[in-house]
Regions:
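Conserved GHKL (Bergerat-fold) ATPase module
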Residues: 1-333
Length: 333
């Protein structure tokens, strides 16, 4: 053991490259790798500046992660800029949710609701999911294990402090931490949509036009969160002349006739066909509102919905309408 002088603190790591790996000695290739995998780690990565007459070093990574900063220190513009960076979308998001979880499990999430549906939204096997980081180190794109399929339009980042750096897609499918994060992030995404629906009805209407059909799938696929999904639904209705889907179940309940116990709806090939259906005649005469559904998935998803706030949902094309106090002897049987 002897004492030696070292110009700087730290550890020197020398990497010897094989002949078929010389590309990793190329400065441009190295910069690209650093920016992809280590752009957000807490430490600066420096490389010799290209074209400098003397040896100069420059930082090639950001050395910070926006999602690790306190929400109070991040501006709306920074959130929007980061969304465009990770999504390659030119439009600002409709909403976002930034959260840090500490305790038994530690992770940070930053979720976004896009303004427009991607071209492959209806390709259920297409690329989807969040960008996954572990302790700020980039792991993979399209980590689809953290949100259910009906929320495939959500963009964002999940950064875990508990997962191993060498995590694989196979390991993600069999991990208790991932299951817990999936449940929590699903709740967080639905809370974000609920807040948007109450705080900005116009923006939520824009969201529904783009993603409403996908969100409906959750009624069938995610029974645990059905009660959170039901208030988010929007329908066309006989109370409106237009076929705009802007009526919530809460709106319907608030307009119930005296003595009316059920929520009535009708499924048809189009809203126009629904409006001209003979099944509506009796209810129109009694001034009872009927929700009009015309999506291809409606027959499938509405089979999973039985009631809302104590009121049964009844398809007017099937069986007894159970009008109760609103019935009269002149009504057809």
């Amino acid at each position: 053991v002897e004492t030696v002088e070292c110009a700087q603190r730290g550890t020197r790591v020398v990497l010897h490259l094989k002949d078929d790996a010389q590309e990793f000695a190329d400065p441009y290739r190295l910069r690209a790798l650093v920016r992809r995998y280590s752009d957000h780690i807490a430490f600066p990565v420096r490389m010799p500046r290209e074209g400098a007459a003397t040896l100069e070093f420059e930082v090639v990574n950001q050395a910070q992660a926006l999602w690790c900063r306190p929400r109070s220190e991040v501006t709306d513009q920074e959130y929007c800029d980061f969304y465009r960076h990770i999504s390659h979308d030119g439009a600002d998001p409709l909403a976002w949710s930034h959260n840090r979880v500490e305790g038994k499990r530690e992770y940070t999430s930053l979720l976004y609701v896009p303004a427009h549906a991607p071209f492959d939204l209806w390709q259920r096997e297409g690329a989807r999911g969040l960008k996954l980081y572990v302790r700020r180190v980039y792991i993979m794109d399209n980590a689809d294990q953290f949100l259910p399929l009906y929320l495939r339009f959500i963009k964002g980042v999940a950064d875990s402090s508990d997962l191993p750096l060498n995590v694989s897609r196979e390991l993600l499918q069999q991990n208790a931490d991932v299951e817990a994060m999936r449940a929590a992030l699903t709740r967080r995404a639905l809370e974000m949509l609920t807040k948007l629906s109450t705080d900005d009805k116009e923006k939520y209407q824009d969201f529904w036009k783009e993603f409403g059909r996908a969100l409906k799938e959750g009624l069938h696929e995610d029974p645990a969160n059905r009660d959170k999904l039901l208030p988010l639904l929007r329908f066309a209705s006989t109370v409106n002349a237009e076929n705009t889907e802007n009526v919530s179940l809460a709106d319907y309940v608030a307009r119930l006739q005296s003595g009316q116990n059920h929520i009535y709806y009708l499924i048809a090939d189009s809203h126009a066909a629904a409006r001209h259906s003979p099944h509506l005649e009796l209810l129109r005469k009694k001034g009872i509102e009927v929700l009009l559904l015309a999506d291809q998935v409606d027959e499938w998803v509405m089979g999973s919905v039985t009631e809302f706030e104590g009121h049964k949902l009844k398809n007017v094309a099937r069986g007894d309408l159970e009008l109760g106090a609103l019935a009269s002897e002149a009504d057809p049987v």
